[in-house]
């Protein structure tokens, strides 16, 4: 009896979720609303650019054997999964992480904590750091970065919320 009740409750819950999804789709003029994903952390990209790209050739070869390939994958995979608009914010975030780490090393301050993700308050990024990131990330990760990223200061770019399409389908195949 308890098993039947639990199965009935589970079926009701699933039916309610499908009904809500259908309502969302039909009100959205044939398109499902997408749920925002948390933004990826860009620390790996900053670490990769500092440790694998900006080092002399001999050190770079040593890193290549140890961890650069993995760091590159961990940087590029989330970058490829976000919208072009969000990539502009990601470029700014990577540039800011590098800037803060360089400032910390210059002034004897501790480096930025690893848990930081992009979308936090922004400082003006030096042009040379931004240029290096803009020249490296798109070709390294085979992604497009919007043209306005090259001319718009990071402090004016608002964090972009991006979505990954829902896996559920709506009634009538509209979504």
Swiss-Prot record:
Keywords: Disulfide bond, Seed storage protein, Signal, Storage protein. Residues 1-19 form the signal peptide. InterPro entries: Bifun_inhib/LTP/seed_sf (IPR036312), Bifunc_inhib/LTP/seed_store (IPR016140), Glia_glutenin (IPR001954). GO terms for molecular function: nutrient reservoir activity. The keyword Disulfide bond applies. SMART domains: AAI (SM00499). Contains 7 disulfide bonds. Gene3D superfamilies: Plant lipid-transfer and hydrophobic proteins. It comes from the Eukaryota. The keyword Methyltransferase does not apply. Coiled coil: none annotated. Seed storage protein. Not integrated in the gluten polymer through disulfide bonds, unless incorporated by reduction and reoxidation during dough making. Increases dough strength and bread volume, but decreases dough stability when added into a base wheat flour. Belongs to the prolamin family. PANTHER family: PROLAMIN PPROL 14P. This is Avenin-like a3.
């Amino acid at each position: 009896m308890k098993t039947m009740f639990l199965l009935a409750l589970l079926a009701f819950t699933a039916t309610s979720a499908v009904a809500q999804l259908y309502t969302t789709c039909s009100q959205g003029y044939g398109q499902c609303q997408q749920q925002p994903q948390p933004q990826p952390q860009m620390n790996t990209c900053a670490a990769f650019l500092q440790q694998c790209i900006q080092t002399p050739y001999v050190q770079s070869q040593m890193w290549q054997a140890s961890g650069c390939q993995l760091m590159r994958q961990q940087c590029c995979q989330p970058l490829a999964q976000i919208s072009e608009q969000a990539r502009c914010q990601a470029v700014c975030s990577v540039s800011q992480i590098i800037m803060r780490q360089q400032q910390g090393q210059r002034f004897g301050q501790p480096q930025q904590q690893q848990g930081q993700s992009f979308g936090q308050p922004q400082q003006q990024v030096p042009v040379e750091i931004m240029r290096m990131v803009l020249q490296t990330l798109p070709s390294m990760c085979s992604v497009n970065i919007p043209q306005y990223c090259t001319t718009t200061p990071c402090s004016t770019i608002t964090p972009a919320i991006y979505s990954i399409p829902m896996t559920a389908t709506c009634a009538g195949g509209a979504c």
